[in-house]
Amino acid sequence: MVKCTIEGYPKGSDITILNTSYIREKKDDDDGSSAYVDYLFILFKDNKTGEKHYCIKNSPSYTYYMVKNGGKLKHHFMFIEEDELEPYTCPYSKLLYDIATKNNFKEWFYNNIRMNNFAGNRQLHTLNHVFYSDIDIEDYYRALFAERYTNEPCKLNKAYLDIEVDGRNRMGEFPESGECPINAISFLNDENNTSYQFILEDKTAPNYNMIQEYKKYINSQNGINELKQFITNTVGGYKKANKYEIDKLQYKFLFYEDEAAMIYDLFQLMRELSPDILLIWNMAFDLSYIRDRIDKLGYNPLDFICDDSIPVKFFRFYVDERNKNEFAERGDFVSVSSYTVWLDQMIQFASRRKGRGQYVSFKLDDIGKEIAGVRKLDYSNITTDIMQLPYLNFKIFSWYNVMDTIVQKCIEAKTQDVEYVTTKSLINNTRLSKAHRQSVYLANRFRKEFKQKGFIMGNNVNIWNEKPTEKYPGAMVGDPTHNSGEPMIKLPTGQSIFVADNVIDYDYKSLYPSITIENNMAPNTQRGKLYIDTQVHDKEHWDMYTSDEETAKYSRAGEMLENMMSGNHIEFCHRWLNLGNIKEVLDDMIELYRATSIKPNVGVKILPFKNVHGIEPMLEYDGMIKGVTFDTEYSDKDKLLSEVRKKAFI
């Protein structure tokens, strides 16, 4: 069994995981040969000292399970008792090979490799008797870390970054990534309440003299005082500046004639200050541009971005091009050998609010205005082209760049999105890049809680199934005003299900978990789908669905189940089981009791029956049954009527 042990930290130590990065790369040997190596980089924080440390797991191990004694299962199990399984441990990079070897699929495994069908080997996870083998290695070690250490949410130090590009010599309408110089970088660090700006003073640029004048001005106390007052006014006055702690900020301006030195010093400062989280709004632009610009200047981005104190160097930046314009779905992430975790602030904002109503725009200016009441600096009285601004008014250009990170800070102060995503990642044992993805974090949460109860979750086999062409019909509709303030149902676990007053809950969504628990609904409790091919009665509702979707077709079996759950048992049996309706049932009852009555010639009057959808309650009718003596427990006509009403109409 694999354990996540960290040297110097015994079980129960108060440390919290910050990030995980699994790296697999090809290494060239001195003799000209090459081989793949893999390792897991774990960044964590000591909550007692506040210091951050790392742990590197070379060729990390992984434990999966199979049914004991070579047992085979006839179908997929959602979960199974851990006592019925045998654990198997192997290097994670050899996981599929190990499963194939132990299940006599070795030749098939190599055939897939020869055919470049590497994804085909992942179907080994669908073997019914194989469990717990399809977890992402980063999530797997997050779970192991949480089992051994406290892993509680901790205080996080945040920083913000924004760059500006000098696009005057661009070839197209907008600079290509890395094409033009970076002429300003704003870096705001929360922990020491300091805003840093790195400014490029290009001697060949037409605005060089303007920059020199600004340099002299901004390095004076008068310049700093004017900047502070300007920032206070821009965010909305002293109250708002105090609310977002903008009034506490100090400002430092650093000027460089060499662009490469400027970028290098930025990362050196980041290493020195070591924020826990670095937030960039639309990181796909800023970080990609920095990386490509370093390369354009003739340097290796690893030498700039990675921390020299860490023995391994890696920098992976994934941009989700498939969801490029769907910000709430974007899966951009950074893996870097650093003591700082990089996050896209825009994606975190959009992902957290997915489904709550679409924002008109996710631009920094629009979100800053709507969330925090703070906007970017408006330079429209000078120019409409940001590329021209540093040549027309360099002071406003510089302050515009500084103001961007201040807007970022105000948004985060208002939303606390970083605390949300990191806490969600911790409690669900899920990597930060997938913390908002329900299909990922819910599966990890299931694994965590089921394992605590002695069960091991099965693998997700649905990813290999074809998408269903039709939907399961069904709905639950109710009037919340009919519910009291008392618990509707008390579950065996002792948990109560409430419906609260003064709560807007469209489509009764809050009841879904309660309904699921009450009825024991889960993949492992499903036994099939009911089909009724031929018409059973003449009252079928072909228009029972309001959806125009092709998949929402009429289901005879669905209507039958809905009728059965309505509680109108007599009408259900009449329609679907060809039994008597209410009139016929009463006729049979009267005929039975008449035949068994002690007194002959009993006079009976029957309430006229009206066959309607959703039978109306039976009205009181004094002359309905007269002079009947029964040899049954219903010797009293009122008692009989009461029982009929009780059992026939719910």
Indicate residue ranges for each PLM-predicted region.
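The two-metal-ion catalytic cores of nucleic-acid processing enzymes
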Residues: M1-T493, I497-I504, Y508-K509, P513-K647
